[in-house]
């Protein structure tokens, strides 16, 4: 494609995707509220507050695809989540509607379903069970995206990211790990598909201990290749076994279920 927008490009995952997604477009437009490293060849850097509708409109203009990693990615006071994940996402979808409806990869989260027990295997249509205000904001985001698809035909992949890290490093991640390579191959598949719609995609690698069923995604032609099982021995040898009553091994959202409702100081 001509120009691919990556929001949240200064974040931990955004910095990884900056390098990995460069071959997908002639120009990579990188955006974040935080300062970005200087633009390299075939890059554009934009400092943008998602809560500023005019800034978001300018950020989206001229883009042929969007990978939306921006916003708040952990549990925070509602006032912060509201600006980045609710107002900000509305601004993004309005900007996309005004600029030809480029296809969107929306970084949703496993915390939309965090209160499900780890004993359950989940398909894409299970009712939401968010484990905090962050998870609630991602439920909002998924529903906003579905409304824009039904009303305007805006296509979005709703990627419920598990644990997108270089390697799994705890027992829960043996089920939730999503390798960087598998995320990149998913993004490639989303933009390659002739028709996308607005599907839920469980953002996880091909983990033997996985809880999530992506069998509905045959039309994408995407198959994750990595498997957290390769790291099980290292985890068991270096990590004390968790208490069976610990949220880390009881709930799919892990310790997020233990978070309080944080208040703005």
Curated annotation (Swiss-Prot):
Note: D-galactaro-1,4-lactone was previously believed to be the product of the reaction of D-galacturonate oxidation.
Organism name: Agrobacterium fabrum (strain C58 / ATCC 33970) (Agrobacterium tumefaciens (strain C58))
GO MF, any single term: uronate dehydrogenase activity
Reaction(s) the record says it catalyses: beta-D-galacturonate + NAD(+) = D-galactaro-1,5-lactone + NADH + H(+); beta-D-glucuronate + NAD(+) = D-glucaro-1,5-lactone + NADH + H(+)
Residue numbers annotated as active site: 134
Record-stated family: Belongs to the NAD(P)-dependent epimerase/dehydratase family.
Enzyme superclass (EC): oxidoreductase
Residues holding substrate: 73, 109-111, 163, 172
Name by which UniProt lists this protein: Uronate dehydrogenase
């Amino acid at each position: 494609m001509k120009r691919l927008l990556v929001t949240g490009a200064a974040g931990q995952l955004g910095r990884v995707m900056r390098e990995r997604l460069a071959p997908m477009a002639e120009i990579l437009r990188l955006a974040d509220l935080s300062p970005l490293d200087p633009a390299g060849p075939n890059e554009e850097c934009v400092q943008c507050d998602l809560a500023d509708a005019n800034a978001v409109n300018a950020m989206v203009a001229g883009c042929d695809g969007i990978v939306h990693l921006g916003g708040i990615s952990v549990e925070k006071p509602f006032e912060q989540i509201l600006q980045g994940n609710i107002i900000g996402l509305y601004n993004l979808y309005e900007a996309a509607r005004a600029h030809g409806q480029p296809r969107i990869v929306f970084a949703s989260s496993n915390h939309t379903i965090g209160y499900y027990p780890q004993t359950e295997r989940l398909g894409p249509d299970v009712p939401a069970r968010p484990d905090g205000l962050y998870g609630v904001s991602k439920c909002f985001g998924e529903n906003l995206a579905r409304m824009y698809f039904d009303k305007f035909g805006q296509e979005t992949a709703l990627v419920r990211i598990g644990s997108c890290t270089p390697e799994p490093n705890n027992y829960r991640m043996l089920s939730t790990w999503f390798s960087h390579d598998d995320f990149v191959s998913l993004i490639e598949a989303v933009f390659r598909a002739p028709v996308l719609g607005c599907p839920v995609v469980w953002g996880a690698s091909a983990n033997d201990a996985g809880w999530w069923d992506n069998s509905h995604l045959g039309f994408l032609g995407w198959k994750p290749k990595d498997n957290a099982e390769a790291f099980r021995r290292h985890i068991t040898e270096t990590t004390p076994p968790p208490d069976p009553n610990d949220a880390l091994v009881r709930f799919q959202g892990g310790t997020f279920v233990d978070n309080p409702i944080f208040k703005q100081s």
